[in-house]
């Protein structure tokens, strides 16, 4: 998020932009640990409008920034089992359509036809959007970073924000592990750490971090030497999410990527397996 903001501000003509990265490598936090999904299927108008802009950027990323990001628009499919979930998604579906999202409402037969590996048990309906997809997070980060630097953005690595200086209610500086930086404008692009940055200026940002696990299972080689593409349905490239259990999966390289949230997981920055 930080490199994207820096790049777009520089494109608009802003100068003296400094991006602070606490780690040695860009994207070493939640960005580098995510599954790379990008979707339009959200429940709030603001999220949908932002995502429409984001998908537009990803679709023209290579042409505009010269960086391949392996953006595959194979779609997201949400599987719906509970009656309450069905009602919520119907409202979301209507909002998404009103805002121009090419989302489809699928009955059970159509959902199973598009994703033959799923079970019909308890399934009531599904939603699908073909503009949703997956990109390589590292390539997106590096593409934005390189383009931002070409426009004059300074990127400081291994520099941690430790405080924000104020004069009355106006920002005067950023306090960092490498010393203060005078500024009157700060963009909080800290992701899961946004709440901690907000507290430096007595602002409550309602963001909480939760540990999640992603697994990748290799598919055994075929005795006849057939490639994975020839042995699996194209539907396995769809990022399929069982909304009520949070289980999701999609094909990843020569295997299957899958994950699931733990409803009892407490909020923390814990990253152990």
Positions of PLM-derived features:
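Gly/Ala-rich phosphate-binding loop of Rossmann-like dinucleotide-binding domains
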Residues: 6, 10-11, 147
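Glycine-rich FAD pyrophosphate-binding loop
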Residues: 10-31
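Active-site lid/adjacent beta-loop-alpha segment flanking the redox-cofactor pocket in flavoenzymes
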Residues: 204, 220-273
């Amino acid at each position: 998020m930080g490199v994207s903001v820096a790049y777009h501000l520089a494109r608009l003509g802003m100068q003296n932009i400094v991006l602070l990265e606490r780690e040695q490598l860009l994207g070493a936090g939640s960005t580098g640990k995510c599954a790379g999904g990008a979707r339009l299927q959200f429940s709030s108008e603001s999220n949908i409008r932002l995502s429409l802009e984001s998908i537009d950027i990803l679709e023209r990323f290579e042409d505009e920034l010269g960086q391949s990001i392996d953006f595959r628009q194979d779609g997201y499919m949400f599987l719906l089992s509970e009656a309450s979930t069905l009602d919520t998604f119907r409202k979301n579906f209507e909002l998404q359509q009103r805002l121009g999202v090419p989302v489809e409402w699928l009955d059970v037969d159509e959902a199973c036809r598009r994703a033959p590996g799923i079970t019909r048990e308890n399934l009531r309906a599904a939603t699908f959007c073909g503009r949703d997809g997956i990109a390589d997070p590292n390539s997106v980060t590096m593409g934005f970073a390189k383009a931002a630097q070409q426009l004059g953005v300074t990127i400081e690595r291994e520099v941690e924000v430790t405080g924000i200086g104020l004069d009355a209610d106006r920002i005067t500086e950023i306090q960092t592990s490498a010393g203060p930086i005078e500024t009157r404008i700060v963009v909080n692009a800290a992701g899961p750490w946004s709440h901690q940055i907000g507290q430096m200026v007595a602002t409550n940002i309602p963001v909480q971090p939760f540990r999640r696990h992603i697994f990748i299972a290799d598919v055994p080689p075929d005795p006849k030497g057939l490639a994975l593409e020839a042995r699996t349905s194209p539907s396995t490239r769809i990022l399929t999410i069982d909304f009520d259990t949070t289980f999701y999966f999609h094909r990843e390289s020569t295997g299957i990527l899958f994950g699931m949230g733990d409803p009892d997981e407490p909020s923390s920055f814990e990253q152990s397996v």
